[in-house]
UniProtKB/Swiss-Prot annotation:
Name of the protein this chain belongs to: Proline--tRNA ligase
Gene: proS
NCBIfam families named among the record's database cross-references: PRK09194.1, proS_fam_II
Subcellular location: Cytoplasm
Listed InterPro entries: aa-tRNA-synt_IIb (IPR002314), aa-tRNA-synth_II (IPR006195), aa-tRNA-synth_II/BPL/LPL (IPR045864), Anticodon-bd (IPR004154), Anticodon-bd_dom_sf (IPR036621), Pro-tRNA-ligase_IIa (IPR002316), Pro-tRNA-synth_IIa_bac-type (IPR004500), Pro-tRNA-Synthase_IIa_type1 (IPR023717)
Xref: Gene3D superfamilies: Anticodon-binding domain (3.40.50.800), Bira Bifunctional Protein, Domain 2 (3.30.930.10)
GO molecular function: aminoacyl-tRNA deacylase activity; ATP binding; proline-tRNA ligase activity
Superkingdom of this protein's organism: Bacteria
Example of a GO cellular component annotation carried by this entry: cytosol
UniProt GO BP: prolyl-tRNA aminoacylation
Catalysed reactions listed for this entry: tRNA(Pro) + L-proline + ATP = L-prolyl-tRNA(Pro) + AMP + diphosphate
EC number: 6.1.1.15
């Protein structure tokens, strides 16, 4: 492609809301242009990157035995009413009416239409398993769309849905899709981790997220430095302490005056306590109106997902109000503890491992020291209710856990019959009986992975794409292209030769100043830069620059061809 035949719309102007590097660089490089809040035009260079990602996704999905289709983006309300999502989805569901006043929505996901199609066309187990996918524009009316295409209202997603007769068949396809997502991200060239994830309201036994590692990631993921264990922070767990090795203390409880101390941090600072010897007692109320005292070590944080999954808790829970707490303890938050606690205690394993702990005295301005489990507090339950921290022992006992930030670009689920059952998507099984098909769903954020790639790899000058998805593999940057016949001749011939070799190449024939050409090339992120100028050309040389390494070489065109091949 010649630069004069496409639209290179680089700019120095940035809106104030462009906080993330990916958002800034996509706007500055002219990859996208904002049309409305959370809605973007894909400019030629941006679309080229997007299409390269789509091609990789499509190629790997086809290799995995999936078949592509395309579902409508506008969905009738009747389908979502069958699964009760018409009302449950909330304001993120963009609803509209046609001229006959019939209700429709812009599809946020496509479970209902794919099940509707399947129930009309799949009648027997003999037609299964079947894995269908699409690459489709979706819309979710985010209240505060932000971060550019990372969290836009309109976005492009690959969503696949598989259909099965039994759980083993579903698990086989799930494992295939897990491997396929790894292949996609490997082929793109991103550093990532598949992590065990919460199934949430969907349920089922299996769910994995695919997280691209980046400092700007909103998700926190943990992984073992000694094994392949990895999980989202919501689900991550740790090796439990051996409570049989806990030392029996001979120290007696002591009540100490702690005026105006309401936080663990202030308590440790003013009283010189080790925070790892303290506990926090927080009161919650579950959906059944039951109160519980949740106990974790002073330097740990509660994990909402784990708590809602406890058998004792009727989810969802809420934190008790200050008034509710005072009516139970006759004390305020910040002074609560486990000694003579009037409600049921659920303590984290790490809190249970502490000997001679420090806690609130259930009396304002007082704390207890030297409190011990099983001696002073005997009525309690133990559960994993906290977030893991760096240094925790991996649950498989191999290595310790480390935390990092990630950007979720893929998520796979075993849906089972969550959608097929309410929509009566039944088949005749091998036993001759009618039963709901089991399903898996597999989402991949095509537009989101583009932003994630920028977050993972960039410098102060612009984007450093993985070569597989760079808008152009090579940029020819001729100095004085429109003024020097010799420069033009060499540049044009090199351009044609590279095209003939199947190399994705851009010839910058705009006649722009060298500084502008070089800055644009760095900003846009072409993988290989070839500068053709009079001085080197007299020696039969050109200047080659690798965008990723920044290495420059003065080489012949023959040597350049070897590098590019």
């Amino acid at each position: 492609m010649k630069a004069t035949q496409t639209l290179i719309a680089t700019t120095k102007e940035l809106p104030k809301e462009a906080v993330l590097i990916s958002h800034q660089y996509m706007l500055k490089a002219g990859l996208i242009k904002k049309l409305a809040s959370g809605i973007y035009t894909w400019m030629p260079l941006g679309l080229k990157v997007l299409q390269k990602i789509q091609n990789i996704v499509r190629d790997e999905m086809n290799k995995a035995g999936a078949s592509e289709l395309l579902l409508p983006s506008i969905l009738p309300s009747e389908l979502l009413q069958e699964t009760h999502r018409w009302d449950k989805f909330g304001p993120e569901l963009l609803k509209l009416h046609d001229r006959h006043n019939r209700d429709f929505c812009y599809g946020p996901t496509h479970e209902e239409p794919i099940v509707d199609m399947a129930r009309d066309t799949i009648k027997s187990y003999k037609q299964l398993p079947l894995n269908l996918y699409q690459i489709q524009t979706k819309f979710r009316d985010e209240i505060r769309p932000r971060f550019g295409v990372m969290r836009a209202r309109e976005f492009i997603m690959k969503d696949a849905y598989s259909f099965h007769e039994n759980s083993q068949c579903l698990r086989n396809t799930y494992n295939t899709m897990y491997a396929t997502y790894c292949n996609i991200l490997d082929k793109i060239g991103l550093a990532y981790r598949p992590v065990k994830a919460d199934t949430g309201a969907i349920g089922g036994d299996n769910s994995h997220e695919f997280q691209v590692l980046a400092n700007a990631g909103e998700d926190i993921i943990c992984y073992s430095n000694g094994s392949d264990y990895a999980a989202n922070i919501e689900l991550a767990t740790y090796a439990k302490s051996d409570l049989s090795k806990r030392v029996n203390s001979q120290n007696t409880i002591e009540k100490i005056h702690t005026p105006n101390i309401k936080t663990i941090e202030k308590l440790c600072k003013e009283m010189s306590f080790d925070i790892k010897k303290t506990i926090k007692t927080m009161v919650i109320k579950d959906a059944g109106g039951n109160f519980f005292a949740l106990v974790i070590r002073g330097d740990h944080e509660l994990n909402e997902t784990k708590i809602n999954k406890l058998d004792q808790i009727i989810a969802p829970y809420t934190l008790a109000t200050k008034e509710e707490i005072f009516s139970i303890f006759n004390a305020n938050p910040g002074s609560l503890g486990i000694y003579n606690c009037p409600i049921s205690i659920i303590a984290d394993y790490s809190a249970i491992a502490i000997t001679d702990l420090v806690c609130g005295a259930n009396e304002d301005d007082y704390h207890f020291t030297n409190v011990n489990w099983d001696r002073d507090v005997t009525n309690y339950q133990i559960a994993d209710i906290r977030n893991v921290v760096t240094g925790d022992i991996s649950p498989d006992g191999k290595g310790t856990l480390e935390l990092t930030n990630g950007i979720e670009v893929g998520h796979i689920f075993e849906l089972e019959d969550v959608y097929s059952k309410p929509m009566n998507a039944n088949i005749i099984g091998q036993d001759g009986k009618s039963k709901p098909m089991l399903m898996g769903c597999y989402g991949f954020g095509v537009s989101r992975v583009m932003a994630a790639a920028i977050e993972q790899s960039h410098d102060e000058n612009g984007i450093i794409w993985p070569e597989s998805i760079a808008p152009y593999q090579v940029a020819i940057l001729p100095i004085n292209y429109n003024k020097s016949d010799k420069i033009k001749e060499v540049a044009d011939k090199l351009y044609q030769d590279l095209l003939g070799d199947g190399i994705d190449v851009l010839l910058d024939d705009r006649g722009a100043r060298p500084g502008v050409m070089f800055a644009d090339a760095d900003l846009i992120g072409y993988s290989h830069h070839v500068v053709i100028g009079d001085r080197l050309l007299e020696q039969g040389l050109i200047e080659y620059k690798n965008r990723k390494t920044q290495e420059k070489q003065e080489i012949t065109i023959a040597e350049l061809i070897k590098i590019l091949k």
